Amino acid sequence: MSGPQNPQAGPGGPPSGPPQPGGPPGPPQGPPQPVQQSKRLQQTQAQVEEVVDIMRVNVDKVLERDSKISELDDRADALQAGASQFEASAGKLKRKFWWKNCKMMIILGGIVAVIVTVIIVWAAT
């Protein structure tokens, strides 16, 4: 078997001539490597810009919410102070009317005592 096994190959050399269909697959035919890398870089940069824009919007929303929460907290503090003042005023008013009611009961009791005394004195005579 001294003859060449591949009819396209010379004696002991690599095949010569165009490759036959159905031969070993070569590298995929596509854009050259630098162009593909540039395209991927542009896509990545576009994605980064999109994420940065979204993050800017999110930060703006967080700052807006923070200001609203601060305003709400201030209003809650003012409401708490007003509620405390109302509670103190209501307590004073309650005591005031309780004493007023006690005075009226004492006066009414005195009037009843005078009337009973007058009736007893009048009945005894």
Swiss-Prot record:
<keyword id="KW-1133">Transmembrane helix</keyword>
<dbReference type="GO" id="GO:0016192">
    <property type="term" value="P:vesicle-mediated transport"/>
</dbReference>
<keyword id="KW-0968">Cytoplasmic vesicle</keyword>
<protein>
    <recommendedName>
        <fullName>Synaptobrevin</fullName>
    </recommendedName>
</protein>
<feature type="region of interest" description="Disordered">
    <location>
        <begin position="1"/>
        <end position="46"/>
    </location>
</feature>
<keyword id="KW-0175">Coiled coil</keyword>
<feature type="transmembrane region" description="Helical; Anchor for type IV membrane protein">
    <location>
        <begin position="104"/>
        <end position="123"/>
    </location>
</feature>
<feature type="topological domain" description="Cytoplasmic">
    <location>
        <begin position="1"/>
        <end position="103"/>
    </location>
</feature>
<feature type="compositionally biased region" description="Pro residues">
    <location>
        <begin position="12"/>
        <end position="34"/>
    </location>
</feature>
<comment type="similarity">
    <text>Belongs to the synaptobrevin family.</text>
</comment>
<dbReference type="InterPro" id="IPR042855">
    <property type="entry name" value="V_SNARE_CC"/>
</dbReference>
<dbReference type="InterPro" id="IPR001388">
    <property type="entry name" value="Synaptobrevin-like"/>
</dbReference>
<dbReference type="GO" id="GO:0030672">
    <property type="term" value="C:synaptic vesicle membrane"/>
</dbReference>
<comment type="function">
    <text>Intrinsic membrane protein of small synaptic vesicles.</text>
</comment>
<keyword id="KW-0812">Transmembrane</keyword>
<feature type="domain" description="v-SNARE coiled-coil homology">
    <location>
        <begin position="40"/>
        <end position="100"/>
    </location>
</feature>
<feature type="topological domain" description="Vesicular">
    <location>
        <begin position="124"/>
        <end position="125"/>
    </location>
</feature>
<dbReference type="GO" id="GO:0043005">
    <property type="term" value="C:neuron projection"/>
</dbReference>
<dbReference type="Pfam" id="PF00957">
    <property type="entry name" value="Synaptobrevin"/>
</dbReference>
<dbReference type="InterPro" id="IPR016444">
    <property type="entry name" value="Synaptobrevin/VAMP"/>
</dbReference>
<keyword id="KW-0472">Membrane</keyword>
<keyword id="KW-0770">Synapse</keyword>
<keyword id="KW-0771">Synaptosome</keyword>
